[in-house]
């Protein structure tokens, strides 16, 4: 298995897009001319921006070729670029009115450097808007950590999944150095999932992908079965058989 799977990602598109809409609702800027969406995935967050600002020039970038291909298929009127924001291939300066990033930064190291780069991409008085998952202390992530570091599986993974989130206090310190006008908040979403299988599918499209990419097909099936069995133990069914999936996220908006 290679790259991200847009089809799996889009299976829960409504739930994944809601934080982008919530982030956009806190951006106070009139008639932006140019916007960039960092880590646009299959274009769902970029479409949210396009619907709000149809007259702006909007660019979506993502380091996944499959995600960019899907985004181009989904939204032909928007420009999408396959590129990695953490490298020098993306080197805009003073160019955008809005730099937007929804559920992407957790995959990118060196947030001190990254946030400075994103702010440098903004025009004066431009807005940086970011949402980052902060659910890594939730039961599902503890389960993934337990399984992937077990004697049975640890030697299968030469590359470990890493999340590069900083603490809220660290983000506050960084933003204070970059902006005199910023605010932060958290929102916890409670997604009602139809079943444990649907919860597994959610993570097959995101958090489990770095592990699945390293396994042979037979191993993929055994690995997913072990994760599934763990999910049935840590997420009890509601009375109607559904699963309540808690997902906290951190947001911040900063003006240049």
Feature roles, as predicted:
Residues 1-33, 44-48, 67-70, 74:
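Conserved class I S-adenosyl-L-methionine
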Residues 34, 126-127:
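Short glycine-centered segments of the SAM/dcSAM-binding site in methyltransferase folds
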Residues 34-89, 113:
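Class I SAM-dependent methyltransferase SAM/SAH-binding core
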Residues 42-44, 160-256:
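Conserved Class I S-adenosyl-L-methionine
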Residues 90-99:
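A short acidic, Gly/Pro-enriched loop at the edge of an enzyme's catalytic core
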Residues 98-111, 134:
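A short SAM/SAH-binding and catalytic strip from SAM-dependent methyltransferases
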Residues 108-109, 122-124:
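Helix-to-beta-strand junctions that scaffold the AdoMet/dcAdoMet cofactor pocket
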